[in-house]
Amino acid sequence: MPLLPAALTSSMLYFQMVIMAGTVMLAYYFEYTDTFTVNVQGFFCHDSAYRKPYPGPEDSSAVPPVLLYSLAAGVPVLVIIVGETAVFCLQLATRDFENQEKTILTGDCCYINPLVRRTVRFLGIYTFGLFATDIFVNAGQVVTGNLAPHFLALCKPNYTALGCQQYTQFISGEEACTGNPDLIMRARKTFPSKEAALSVYAAMYLTMYITNTIKAKGTRLAKPVLCLGLMCLAFLTGLNRVAEYRNHWSDVIAGFLVGISIAVFLVVCVVNNFKGRQAENEHIHMDNLAQMPMISIPRVESPLEKVTSVQNHITAFAEVT
């Protein structure tokens, strides 16, 4: 027996909640457990790429994790809620009901207002992308085990015991380090940069939201300034990681690519550039019309047209003669 539309919608909602819960759990295991073993990468004796001074714990950074995570989680929520509320109120004030989404039935008994539905949809996709970015970054750090620029300052290798008579001698193995194991493990997880990826993901998602949603007059200059300001903050976050010797340039660039790719994919392919359901249905309808086969109907000439054609030929012949 086929599922009713309401039951199918309810089933898909539960399925999406399971996917979201699984994504959050996977990010938790990557972030706070030792389930995934970090690849132990070796190094050359006195390698200048890893001899930078230790900049201190992450909390002493110019962009501490608490500040970064708070902004990445709070600013998009505030902007999207304010933006959707403003758009909804503007449509009510101008009585633009054609472009406004309709109230639909969700599940068996729940009627969802379009304002609530759009806000939850966009924030839910953003939250999913935030955890997905964290998973991508942690997976890359675990697999590569790339060393931080200040790795040797934390590793504190005993060069005499290791026999580092030449700079070209390669050292491998965890026993080569004598420093704090927890700090050493963190120094092995730098590629790609998590701070760069999360900051540029939040900035890119918000930039595309502002560009595609805010259509008010007089915002031709305000929108670019706001969007470029968000991207500039993300760019400065990556530069700060390099300036404080916490990441290499390659780590930051890779983090930028991960964050931008996930944001663009979710906005373009999942939320359809923040368009409403009505616009999506119209687009699908036009695509279906374009794909329909063209049927050619033969033209039937009427007797009156035949008589008119004969008279025209006779008149033309008389004029020539």
Swiss-Prot record:
Task: Give me the segments passing through the membrane.
Answer: 10-30, 62-82, 122-142, 196-213, 225-245, 252-272
Q: By its UniProt entry, which SMART domains does this protein fall under?
A: acidPPc
Indicate yes or no for the key word Acyltransferase: no
List where in the cell it is found: Cell membrane
Molecular functions (GO terms): phosphatidate phosphatase activity
Name the GO cellular-component terms: plasma membrane
What the entry lists under InterPro entries is as follows:
P_Acid_Pase_2/haloperoxi_sf (IPR036938), P_Acid_Pase_2/haloperoxidase (IPR000326), PA_PP_rel (IPR043216)
**Known tissue expression:** Isoform 1 is expressed in brain, lung, kidney and colon. Isoform 2 is expressed in placenta, skeletal muscle and kidney.
User: How is this protein named in the record?
Assistant: Phospholipid phosphatase-related protein type 5
Cited CDD domains: PAP2_wunen
GO terms for biological process, alphabetical: phospholipid dephosphorylation; phospholipid metabolic process; positive regulation of filopodium assembly; positive regulation of neuron projection development; signal transduction
Query: How the protein sits in the membrane?
Result: Multi-pass membrane protein
Family in the record: Belongs to the PA-phosphatase related phosphoesterase family.
Per UniProt, which keywords does this protein have? Cell membrane, Membrane, Transmembrane, Transmembrane helix
- The protein's superkingdom reads Eukaryota
- Entry function: Induces filopodia formation and promotes neurite growth in a CDC42-independent manner; impedes neurite growth inhibitory-mediated axonal retraction.
